[in-house]
Structure formats: structure tokens, C-alpha cells
């Protein structure tokens, strides 16, 4: 089903943030920080994979993703949708179905046997590929998949993350010649927390300290204090 409605961006961001709270996908633990794929320590973590277990929410989020892409990228800009191992794969399948496009998936590394393939599915050379991930912090993991697709002859000018941490600029994407699309950020989640009083004052203060200076917070709490972008 092709998307034909285009909700306001702020409404989509707020609703996704509320959905994440509703399904208990927002986690906080400053005493034992979460380790992100970037190596950063974080007092907060979003489990976007939980979205898959709630059909009404899952469908709405795919509506939001399709709306975002069609409005901001265009209706005929992609030949296929790619999901990265592992969290991006189910979302790629859902979005490809929503946009009536083929789907491929990309392994973190070649599987080491058989065809030794890193990309699974049909991707003719020159295909314009959209890469989707459930979330991204600074783009490091997404670019592993983008680089593999480009090496195999695909063209990647766009990526989408359902949730973007929003704590860094998008320089990595600009440098890699990829436009990043996203629906919500931590600021949206925090706004809902304040509105509905879901965090106490101490927790709010700790989360805001992280969002305002993420690498400094990470370095003080056992994570990396700089990123290679």
C-alpha cells in the first residue's frame, strides 16, 4: 500500500516518542550505563526492536517512515530497500512492502561459506538503494552496510533511522554523501517524559547532562570520549 497521507513532522516525532514510552522501550540506568555500538556509554537506551511486537504501532511507524521518505526524498528515488543485520532486516521488509519495492539485506561481514555473500537478495548494479536501521547514534554501523552496498555496485544517497539519537550533528552523513532521514530523537522522548512526568528530577538532570555533552558523559562513565567519524 503506497502512502497517501503526510502527517506533520512534529506530530510524527511526538507520537513515536509516546509509542516508545507506551511499550516500555525507553530504559534508564546511570549507575550501570548502556554500551552503544559506537563504544559510547549512555544512561539511556531505546529498544526499537520492541516496535515489531505491537502490530498497530508497527504499522503506524511504517506509515510515518513512508511519509517521511516520499515527502523528503521523492516518490521514484529508490529501486530497493536494504536492511542491515540484524535489527534493520524486519523493518526493511515492512518498509519495502509499504512502498512496493524489492528488499535486500546486508550482513555485517561475508558469511564465510557458500557464496561468501555479504548482500542477500537481488541488487542489479546501479540500483538506487535506501538503507534502513532501527536507530543510529553517529552513523557508524549504518555506513558499514552502505559501504558494502556501494562496493557491490549499488548507489546509496539516502538512509533512514526510525530513531536518531540526535546528540551529534550529521557530519558523518554529509561527508559520506548520504542524506539521513529520521522520525524522532531523544529530545522528543525527553519532551514526553517532562510532559507526563515519567522521569524524576534527578533522572531528568542526568539525561539532559548526557544529551548536552554526550562524549564527556561517556568518558566519565567508562565509555569512549571521542568518535572516529
UniProtKB/Swiss-Prot annotation:
CDD domains: PRTases_typeI. It catalyses: orotidine 5'-phosphate + diphosphate = orotate + 5-phospho-alpha-D-ribose 1-diphosphate. One of its GO terms (biological process) is 'de novo' UMP biosynthetic process. It is an enzyme of class 2 (transferase). Orotate binds at residue 137. InterPro entries: OPRT, Or_phspho_trans_dom, PRibTrfase_dom, PRTase-like. Keywords: Glycosyltransferase, Magnesium, Pyrimidine biosynthesis, Transferase. Gene3D superfamilies: 3.40.50.2020. GO terms for molecular function: magnesium ion binding; orotate phosphoribosyltransferase activity. Its cofactor is Mg(2+). Its EC number is 2.4.2.10. Pathway: Pyrimidine metabolism; UMP biosynthesis via de novo pathway; UMP from orotate: step 1/2. 5-phospho-alpha-D-ribose 1-diphosphate binds at residues 107-108, 111, 113, 133-141. Catalyzes the transfer of a ribosyl phosphate group from 5-phosphoribose 1-diphosphate to orotate, leading to the formation of orotidine monophosphate (OMP). HAMAP family: PyrE (MF_01208). PANTHER family: OROTATE PHOSPHORIBOSYLTRANSFERASE, URIDINE 5'-MONOPHOSPHATE SYNTHASE. Belongs to the purine/pyrimidine phosphoribosyltransferase family. PyrE subfamily. Homodimer. This is Orotate phosphoribosyltransferase. It comes from Rhizobium johnstonii (strain DSM 114642 / LMG 32736 / 3841) (Rhizobium leguminosarum bv. viciae).
